[in-house]
Amino acid sequence: LNPTDLQVEIKARPPGEAVALAARMVQHRPGPFLGAWAFYTLGTVAVGHLLLRVLHLHWAWVLALVPLLAPIFSLPMTTTAGHLVFSPRVAFRTVAATTIRRGAPFLLLFVANRVLTLLGLAAFVVPGLYLWRASWFLGPVVTLEGSSMEASFRRGRRFAIGFHGHVFGHAFNAAMLLVYLTIAFTSLAHFLVAKVFGQTFTALAELPLQDGYYAYITLVGFALAAPFVTLVWFFVYLDVRIRKEGWDLEIAFRSRAAKMEQGHA
């Protein structure tokens, strides 16, 4: 297929289509995705535990800061998705090699972005919101655009920041859904633990989770959901970029999937 012959209209993919496409991607190569998912989830829980037990922050502050800090563990997830789109035989070693090679610029950009974002939001200035919206694209930009910090920053300005207004609605919808599901999961778990199991198992009161376990349950719920939201957001970003260049993400995926099925035949 010649990209110039497609003449694809440049518009964002609806959230439902992005979720369905992400689910099909995961079904083709579940191993690398599950590994990246576990890395993201365990890293997020570790950060929350550090804030709660080492820095002794109130759980409300922890739940507010974790969404800002957790995406530092997202690079393996976006790397897996990027490799799967362009190379259907993505393996653990490929994802690990790319993550290590591009980890340094990602970390430097992540720290700088979060510091500036917090300063901007603390001062209630527009650049804080601007950087927060642009930071959604940090993982995909570093994953796809190069390993050097200079190249990532230069191309990130061209692709990511230029597109953030176009697909900001997807990020907002995903964030609201994530918050809703987290609250629903937390409320249900709190009811079951406190009202049902607490009446049956007297040893439950002696568990260390009893002290602040509500925060831990919320944290785990977020840590389990965040990788999938990141994955869907990556496909939204990638869809916009591919359409900008005349391609369509669905066509590219079907082509790669067909090649992979032929290879297994």
Regions picked out by a protein language model, each given a short descriptive name:
Residues 1-265:
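Hydrophobic alpha-helical membrane segments
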